[in-house]
């Protein structure tokens, strides 16, 4: 690859979900060294205050990591994946409560949260449900105008970000497949949970060097993004995180990445 390729010097954040319970703790710890931002579970779909506190401490130990909230519908039984229905008022309240809980624990470590990432079914709804996306964005804005909303490439999310005047950072997914419109397909446990290194490497190269994703028909489409999600709950997750980190010359936390409007114009 020619060293003058503009995408090699792009500013890219690498984000990781942590604090998702004892079963994932060791894997999360191994991947932390490759991340620049972490999204910490706030207790709605998994975790409890003590686990959240340990996750914050672990992130602080690594130094330089941006701290974010991993928000979800209140769904401990379904790990945030069930199709929960809340009124706009209920959704607003749970988002603000989750942000407040993480902000309070982070403050005890002399840290501030800088971004918010939806999880599970809430993440999927941010793709096409304008009402849900708007409610989440407004709740974030109420809490702090400075927080960055991290989510899937979506015209709905882009419009909501502009309307509510909060910064939206689109993320790319190595662990998921894409549709022709640039949106991610829902997670398929049989296929996506067993992502092999060869496929992951090809997807990472397309993202980092070409800012593109390959569809199932082998066609490439452009995908403008600011952050790449490092999955922690699939096979080969540590190896995948390592190879992605090796391709990005100088990853930077979202809060330090220069915001440029063209990154919000996709397809």
Regions found by a protein language model. Name each.
Residues 40-45, 125, 143-153:
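Catalytic beta/alpha-barrel core
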Residues 76-115:
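Glycine/small-residue-rich loop that forms an oxyanion/phosphate-binding "nest" at active or ligand-binding sites
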Residues 154-213, 219-221:
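Active-site rim beta-loop-alpha module in soluble metabolic enzymes
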Residues 147, 241-267:
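C-terminal domain-boundary segment and adjacent tail
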Residues 29-33, 54-68, 106-110:
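Acidic (Asp/Glu)-rich catalytic clusters
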Residues 12-18, 38-40, 67-71, 114-118, ...:
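Hydrophobic faces of well-ordered beta-strands that scaffold small-molecule active sites
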Residues 108-114, 212-224, 254-262:
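Flexible, glycine/charged-enriched surface loops at secondary-structure junctions
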Residues 37-45, 77-92, 126, 183-195:
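Glycine-rich tight-turn/loop motif centered on a GG-T
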């Amino acid at each position: 690859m020619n060293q003058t390729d503009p995408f090699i010097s792009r500013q890219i954040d690498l984000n990781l979900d942590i604090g998702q319970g004892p079963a994932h703790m060791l894997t999360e710890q191994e991947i932390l060294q490759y991340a620049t931002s972490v999204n910490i579970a706030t207790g709605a779909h998994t975790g409890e205050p003590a686990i959240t506190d340990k996750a914050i401490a672990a992130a602080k130990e690594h130094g330089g990591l941006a701290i974010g909230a991993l928000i979800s519908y209140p769904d401990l039984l379904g790990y945030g994946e069930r199709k929960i229905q809340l009124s706009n008022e209920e959704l607003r309240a749970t988002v603000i409560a989750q942000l407040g809980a993480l902000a309070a624990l982070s403050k005890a470590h002399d840290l501030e949260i800088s971004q918010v990432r939806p999880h599970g079914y809430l993440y999927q709804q941010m793709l096409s449900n304008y009402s849900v996306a708007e409610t989440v964005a407004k709740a974030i804005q109420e809490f702090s105008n400075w927080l960055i909303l991290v989510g899937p490439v979506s015209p709905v999310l882009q419009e909501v970000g502009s309307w509510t005047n909060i910064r939206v950072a689109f993320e790319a997914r190595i662990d998921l497949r894409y549709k022709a419109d640039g949106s991610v397909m829902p997670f398929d446990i049989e296929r996506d949970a067993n992502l092999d290194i060869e496929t992951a490497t090809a997807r990472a190269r397309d993202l980092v060097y070409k800012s593109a994703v390959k569809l199932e028909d082998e066609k490439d489409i452009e995908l403008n993004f600011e952050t790449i999600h490092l999955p922690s709950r699939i096979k080969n997750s540590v190896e995948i995180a390592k190879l992605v980190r090796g391709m990005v010359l100088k990853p930077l936390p979202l809060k330090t990445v220069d915001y440029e409007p063209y990154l919000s114009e996709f397809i």
